[in-house]
Amino acid sequence: MTLPTEIFGDVIVVHTPEEVGADQADGLESLLVTLERRNVVVDLDATETIDSKGLNALAESQRNLRELGGDLKLATAVQSNRKILEMTRLDRQFEVFESVIDAVRSFR
């Protein structure tokens, strides 16, 4: 899986696709743990649909990155995405920011 990325110092931002579901979950998880940076921000603003497989891929990626000394944080201003994170209580596991810039700055 290839997704658009941006690098800000030791942080890489990954922009997710419109759908993050079962078809994309394995590829997303593999991508996130093989990046050249260990501090990752996942930008969910373009994502309209995310299911349990997609959420699990994010959670597993965060766990793997933390084992490697990094972290994974989320950025989204989209209310439906924020609601899903709240309903699944993943907003307690992840640091969730309104903007990519705020998420990147949190690593400093």
Predicted regions and their residues:
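Conserved catalytic submotifs in the C-terminal HATPase_c
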Residues: 8, 45, 101
